[in-house]
Structure formats: structure tokens, C-alpha cells
């Protein structure tokens, strides 16, 4: 391990998997002597871990690089600053990033950040440049190991990467590659190490997490690859882990084993994120979603039959090419039927290289904005109604940190709602029962019932 003290600043854009990747980058760089800096001004190495899902994602990165340029020039006389671009913009743009922004020293894709020590050394040699955007997912997790630096009581754990669905609006198959799953033993080793460090809740991550198809535990090879339902049950056996979540799923990969896991695995939280994107079968077909609106609703019905207290969240896109008023009304109808607890909604934006970007019947931006406003009003009302339905209920809350007010605690309900309650600091890291007394669109508040339980 290096004894030279260096400072690292990582700016993370986008999804939970990027948050996980940023944490693992810190793990990789700690043996080199890097410690976290609060701002770029205090850093020797700045990494922009980027997302390419939304419109103008790359331009946002170039704007940030423009802001970093004078800072790098200023530091040139006092040891210098290394700037790296990582993540999905790095994968999509590659060497073009260094052409457009010479301030960048290295570019590393989401499957090769385990090579950061070598790439940094390469970039430092004679002030050169370093680039690696190969797809080497298996090698990455072998190199990363299971030891992680963690804070708090919840952690993300990537179990699956990539996507083979090729939705016509999405860049993920091009930036994250084909679907690949980690072996069960490797995942379990990482989660056991997290539990030993005080983690009480894990969220299993994947671009298509319910497509998980990992090698079974040692000695059980005859069983063949395990699905996500089997993995969830296995993780539930790990001492110290009280709560399990997973995201993000695709309707095509839902199976009865996973649905049944909601019924028979109490540690699996009753909150499920299942994107649908549209309620019109015509638009779903054009998106290449490979399911109909009725098939989506049928999955929700099966989930609610298995776990009556389950809440559903989703994703919606308005203004996809060819969307008519009737298509949009079908989306509103689906939303009314499902009654989402929460739902992310966006205007369609062209992603370069995707089939959707080349479609001729693009929807006017004004129409998109108007439809989004209507949809978001409906979704906001549903979220408020869901939160208000908690009033009078007693919920188990994982207390994560002190609240903003003195003597207050902040925690999360099984449904990922923020919960504020007055209570002693020693409850942090434990699950306590809270009677909900008030609700807003974004949080709940209540009082402790006196019941609490330490982690298993």
C-alpha cells in the first residue's frame, strides 16, 4: 500500500449501479493512498462517473470538464490534477472524449474500472493518455474482491450487468453490454463481508436484475444456474441482513419462483420497481418491450396475490415516436388500474444510435411537455394517496441517521419512504416500530411504539 496521501473526488451521475461502481472505484484506489475529498478543489484525482440514459448526458459531462479545466491549470504548478471520465458516457464516446476535452487524462468504461491503478500510472507516464472501454465483466469482479469500504447501514450490491432486450429507446445494451450474472458464492461473500461491517439492508442491482442467471453455490452445481428468486432466499439466510431489495426488473423476466419469494421471504421488502414505460400496446411494440399492457397488469395481480401488502413503483415515458392522444390515454388508464406507490416519468429523448432516434414520427416537444404534466399530476396524486394510507399503521423502520431536528431520527419504511421520528441515537442501525401519524408526498412522521429489534 502506498504511504503517499492523495485525495480523490468522484462525481456520480445516474443510477444506483453507478453509485455502487463509484464505491468500488474508491476501494480500488485506497491501496494507492487515495482518500476522499469533499470537492474537486481539494483533489489530486477527479473522476466523473457518468450516465448516458437521458438527453444531453454527454454535453453535461463536457460542461463539467470545462469547469474543471481552469482548476487543473491552477494546480499544474503544485503537483497537478488527474481527470478521468468513467461510466456509460465513457463507454459510448471513448477516445472522442479526449479529442473534445484535452483536459481529460484517462477514459475508463464500466467494465474496466478495476484497472484504474494501471491506467493512472499509464496516464502519468510522460503526461500521456489512457483509455480502456473493453467488456471484461468477469475479470472485473474477480479483481474487485469482496472487501468494501462502507458507511451507514444500507448498501448496493451488483449481481447482474448488461441487457439483451434492446428496447428501441435505450442505450444500455450498447454501453453495458450483454447480460451477465455473478456467481452466487461471489455475491454471498460480498454480502457477508458487508453484514460483518454493520450493513443491515442490501439492494441487489442489475440493469435487468430479474434476468439473473448465476452459477449456483459450490457443491450444488447439479442444480444448474440459479434465478433471482433462489438468490434472494439464499441471501436471506445471511446473519445480520434484515432487509433485501432488488432493482431494476423487466416484465419479460418475471417468473413464479421470484413472485413466490415475495410470499415466503419476510426479509424481502414489499416494494417492487417494475418499469412498464407505456400503456399502449402499439407503443410497447414500437419500443420492443416484448410484453403487452395486459401482461404487465397480470404480473402486478400475481404479485399482489402473493404479497397483499406489496407496493408497486414504475417508469413511464411520454411522447415516444408515434404516440397519439389515444395511446397516451391508454397510459393514463394503465396508471389508474395499477395505482402506483411511486413512478418515475420522463419525456422521450433521442439517444444516438438507438432505433427510436431514427423513427420519423417524432412527437412535438410541446405535446410531450403537456402530456408529461398530466401524467405527473396523476402520479403525484397516487403517491400522496399511498403515503396517506400509512397513517394509523405501525411500520418497521430502519433508522439510518440523525434527523435534521435535535432528538430526531431519520429512517426508511419497507416502502422506501423517509420516516422522521423523535428517538434516541442508539436506535440508529436498528429496526424499530413506528406508528405513522402524518404523511406528505415525500415523507412520513410518527412516534415510536416502544418495540424495537436489533439486527438478526
UniProtKB/Swiss-Prot annotation:
EC primary class: transferase
Residues given in the record as [4Fe-4S] cluster 1 binding sites: 15, 51, 88
Keyword set, alphabetical order: 4Fe-4S, Cytoplasm, Iron, Iron-sulfur, Metal-binding, S-adenosyl-L-methionine, Transferase, tRNA processing
Keyword Glycosyltransferase attributed: no
Cofactor: [4Fe-4S] cluster
SUPFAM superfamilies hit by this protein: Radical SAM enzymes (SSF102114)
Annotated GO CC locations: cytosol
Single Gene Ontology MF annotation: 4 iron, 4 sulfur cluster binding
Primary role: Catalyzes the methylthiolation of N6-(dimethylallyl)adenosine (i(6)A), leading to the formation of 2-methylthio-N6-(dimethylallyl)adenosine (ms(2)i(6)A) at position 37 in tRNAs that read codons beginning with uridine.
Family classification: Belongs to the methylthiotransferase family. MiaB subfamily.
PANTHER family from the UniProt entry: CDK5 REGULATORY SUBUNIT-ASSOCIATED PROTEIN 1 (PTHR43020), MITOCHONDRIAL TRNA METHYLTHIOTRANSFERASE CDK5RAP1 (PTHR43020:SF2)
HAMAP family linked to this entry: tRNA_metthiotr_MiaB (MF_01864)
Protein name: tRNA-2-methylthio-N(6)-dimethylallyladenosine synthase
Organism: Maricaulis maris (strain MCS10) (Caulobacter maris)
Amino acid at each position: 500500500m502506498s504511504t503517499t496521501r492523495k485525495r480523490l473526488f468522484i462525481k456520480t451521475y445516474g443510477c444506483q449501479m453507478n453509485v455502487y461502481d463509484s464505491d468500488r472505484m474508491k476501494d480500488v484506489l485506497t491501496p494507492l493512498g487515495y482518500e476522499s475529498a469533499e470537492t474537486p478543489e481539494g483533489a489530486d484525482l477527479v473522476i466523473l462517473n457518468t450516465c448516458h440514459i437521458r438527453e444531453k448526458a454527454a454535453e453535461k459531462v463536457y460542461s463539467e470538464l470545462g469547469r474543471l479545466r481552469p482548476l487543473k491549470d491552477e494546480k499544474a504548478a503544485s503537483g497537478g490534477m488527474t481527470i478521468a471520465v468513467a461510466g456509460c458516457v465513457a463507454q459510448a464516446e471513448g477516445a472522442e472524449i479526449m479529442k473534445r476535452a484535452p483536459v481529460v487524462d484517462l477514459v475508463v468504461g464500466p467494465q474496466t474500472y478495476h484497472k484504474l491503478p494501471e491506467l493512472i500510472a499509464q496516464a502519468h507516464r510522460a503526461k500521456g493518455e489512457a483509455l480502456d472501454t473493453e467488456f471484461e465483466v468477469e475479470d472485473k469482479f474477480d479483481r474487485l474482491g469482496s472487501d468494501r469500504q462502507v458507511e451507514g447501514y444500507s448498501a448496493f450490491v451488483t449481481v447482474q450487468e448488461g441487457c439483451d432486450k434492446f428496447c428501441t429507446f435505450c442505450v444500455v445494451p450498447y454501453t453495458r453490454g450483454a447480460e451477465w450474472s455473478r456467481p452466487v458464492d461471489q455475491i454471498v461473500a460480498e454480502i457477508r463481508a458487508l453484514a460483518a461491517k454493520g450493513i443491515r439492508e442490501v439492494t441487489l442491482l442489475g440493469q435487468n436484475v430479474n434476468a439473473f442467471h448465476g452459477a449456483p453455490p459450490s457443491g450444488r452445481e447439479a442444480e444448474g444456474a440459479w434465478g433471482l428468486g433462489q438468490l434472494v432466499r439464499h441471501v436471506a439466510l445471511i446473519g445480520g441482513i434484515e432487509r433485501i431489495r432488488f432493482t431494476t426488473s423487466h416484465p419479460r423476466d418475471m417468473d413464479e419462483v421470484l413472485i413466490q419469494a415475495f410470499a415466503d421471504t419476510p426479509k424481502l421488502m414489499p416494494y417492487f420497481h417494475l418499469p412498464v414505460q407505456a400503456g399502449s400496446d402499439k407503443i410497447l411494440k414500437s419500443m420492443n418491450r416484448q410484453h403487452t399492457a395486459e401482461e404487465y397488469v397480470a404480473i402486478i395481480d400475481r404479485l399482489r396475490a402473493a404479497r397483499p401488502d406489496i407496493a408497486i413503483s414504475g417508469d413511464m415515458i411520454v411522447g415516444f415516436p408515434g404516440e397519439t392522444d389515444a395511446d397516451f390515454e391508454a397510459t393514463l388508464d394503465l396508471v389508474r388500474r395499477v395505482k402506483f406507490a411511486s413512478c418515475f416519468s420522463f419525456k422521450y429523448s433521442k439517444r444516438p444510435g438507438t432505433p427510436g432516434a431514427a423513427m420519423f414520427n417524432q412527437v412535438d416537444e410541446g405535446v410531450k411537455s403537456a402530456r408529461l404534466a398530466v401524467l405527473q399530476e396523476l402520479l403525484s396524486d397516487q403517491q400522496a394517496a399511498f403515503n396517506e394510507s400509512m397513517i394509523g399503521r405501525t411500520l418497521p423502520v430502519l433508522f439510518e441517521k440523525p434527523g435534521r431536528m435535535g432528538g430526531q431520527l431519520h429512517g426508511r419504511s419497507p416502502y422506501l419512504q423517509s420516516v422522521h421520528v423523535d428517538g434516541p441515537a442508539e436506535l440508529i442501525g436498528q429496526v424499530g416500530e413506528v406508528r405513522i401519524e402524518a404523511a406528505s408526498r415525500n415523507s412520513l412522521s410518527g412516534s415510536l411504539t416502544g418495540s424495537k429489534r436489533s439486527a438478526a
